């Protein structure tokens, strides 16, 4: 195992160790709450406890793996190119980066302005994909078309500074890249428009010409090698605006390490955590 591979395995180990400790900390409380749900009253307590774990793991693991992705991206691009405060235009601010979890963009554009948000919503809505099969036309939201949002957003510059959280942002040596990153592999159709508009607002607020925006997922819900069928495809051009599963990881993994090797390192880290034994013991203690 190379030093870089060891660093990646340790990142996964550290972040998932925090995750499991977090789940263990409030598991009993969450289990007791489920016991009051009469809809589950006929289920065995062990089944209920397993349901509680799965729900808790799915809701909390997203942050853990997103943190892993950020730390891994820093191995490839350098800490300075995956900053906590994303501020390529050097907007003046007084934010202490130590008070921020995750990443925030800093901008002099009022990203909460109603008119700006309305314009972005209109841009998305007028560029949705249409039709099916051979008659389908892809969304007009492309890396080229979104550049029209930059001069439009400059009309909403305001005094002081504004911040906007971003799932992942980095400078790859040529472009600033901002991502809406989903641990769950997709969004339902009702949430897709709002999430696309959030990403476009971040892109407009960043407001640098050498920038790109992507919708990304940690895995391909249709299976690697298969065409992804997510709801967001209606609102952004596919595949141009997407980094799905393997494609996402191969963008941020250090040179020489591919997605397949990363999944091996991930499994090694979770085996070292003795994840299954800890989960089973936690459930056993709770239902006894």
Go through the PLM ranges and name each one.
Residues 73, 166-185:
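Conserved catalytic cores of phosphodiester-cleaving nucleases, focusing on short active-site segments
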Residues 79-81, 204-212, 234-246:
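Structural alpha-beta junctions
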Residues 177, 203-234:
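Nucleic-acid nuclease catalytic cores
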Residues 1-95, 285-288:
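Nuclease-adjacent, charged terminal/linker segments that flank catalytic cores
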Residues 3-18, 228-288:
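Non-catalytic C-terminal interaction segments of nucleic acid-processing enzymes
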Residues 184-207:
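Mg2+/Mn2+-dependent nuclease catalytic core
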